[in-house]
Amino acid sequence: NNGPVELGLGATQTPWDNRTVTWVTAVDTLNDLRPWPQPGAGPVTSIGTTVWDPAEGDSAWFELDSLQVEAWADTADVSRGARIESLTDNARLQVSRVVLRLDTRPSSNPDTIIVLSAQRDEISFVYDPIPEAPENGIRIGGAPAWRTVLNVKIPTHLDGPAELCVAAGGCPLELKPLELNYAAITLKSERGEQAFQPTDSIGLDVRQVLRRDALPKAPLGESLTGLLGQRVGPDAFGSKSETDIEIPITEFVRDLLGSQDGMSPTKTLALLSVFEPISIAYASFHGPGNENGPVLRLVVTVGRAMELP
């Protein structure tokens, strides 16, 4: 946002789950669905307002009294939390860090001021209306976090290209795990809704769905992309949309090629954000069913059988 924004702070009164919270739902976990008494994380006990002006810095402050600090220090209160809301229309802000700063004066030494800082435990975003699910697209990230599930078709034999058939001495060629050097899903980015355009890099993660019959809350395997995931810059969903993004899945494909009958792992992958949720912005890609849809890229090394004299 380019101009001043008025912000309001209130103390929550209802228990909520940071991974599943929405504008109307405080908790939406397995066998536990609880709505907010008031849509929008309400009701709250109003604490105060402040104005953030980007021309004056990147931080905003709310003044708290000792009673509110004491209430938030009660770890037995599962409803404790704070709602920060924008009171300015047509403004979009991303809260990257929240700190509770305490200036205390010990009774034993009243001439001394001690400054303490407490980091936040959980954070999420609620808003209304939530964008409609894409009719034939892939969406990753946002808050609540969007995920996309793909069934991957792994070929057991290759019939081309012609250069491969010549190198192998003919086709079809059986695809073996040891001959696979690299495998990746290639996604083509697209421009999403303006209000949800990423302004920072997004870390894409890929995990194997361990039980497809348990979707949409199926358990997932370990990350196939590492700690930080596959990083994609924000321009890929704006000025540089239609960019090809590769997400390596080599070990996943090797495991499928090497699996035995009756012990085949699931061929379903979940595409998600590394950190969920981190902002309302999400990544958009073209979905299956058209020329810009996901593509499986394979790099193999093959050689002809040779006979020694």
Language-model segment annotations:
Residues 1-309:
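Secreted, disulfide-rich extracellular signaling modules
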